[in-house]
Amino acid sequence: MGGRGADAGSSGGTGPTEGYSPPAASTRAAARAKARGGGRGGRRNTTPSVPSLRGAAPRSFHPPAAMSERLRPRKRRRNGNEEDNHLPPQTKRSSRNPVFQDSWDTESSGSDSGGSSSSSSSSINSPDRASGPEGSLSQTMAGSSPNTPQPVPEQSALCQGLYFHINQTLREAHFHSLQHRGRPLT
């Protein structure tokens, strides 16, 4: 049992708890350098004593914001080996940009042309902002050149076609809810 006690005491300095031991930041930096350098075979394995000193000095020198910036890429590098786990979020990100931004744009303009009761409950400021410029754009374009094809009414007609059924259902639901409450129609 005495051997185990000695091993437990010595493992605190050389084992995995070395990264969390409070004596000095240089031991933590050395443990991190060993952990990273062993798996990747990087440049830190060539001179193990120099990186521990260099690793400790900038960490104590830089403000906490710089430390957090340094820690983030390390986490990405450690997780870089598990790229299979990161593929679904990347596909979600790539699908968000072209597809969902367009659908959100058309949805906002479609909800502006449709039932105001449903759009006012979700967001108050965005329908007012979106309906103001769209209405003024379509009026100025119609007044300036009536023979020219107008992209704004075409887009709004497309949105009305896509969201007409949804807006109609929302209007009916609102109508029925007002009837059940006993309030007169507005």
UniProtKB/Swiss-Prot annotation:
Basic residues: which segments have biased composition? 31-43
Q: Which Pfam families match?
A: FAM104 (PF15434)
Matches recorded under InterPro entries: VCF1/2-like (IPR029222)
Which residue intervals make up region (Disordered)?
1-156
Recite the UniProt keywords alphabetically. Methylation
Top-level taxon of origin: Eukaryota
Q: Where is the composition biased (Gly residues)?
A: 1-16
- Compositionally skewed regions (Polar residues) per UniProt: 136-147
Q: Where is the composition biased (Low complexity)?
A: 108-123
Positions modified as Omega-N-methylarginine?
R4
Please state which protein family the record places this protein in: Belongs to the VCF family.
State what protein this is by name.
Protein VCF1
Organism, as annotated:
Homo sapiens
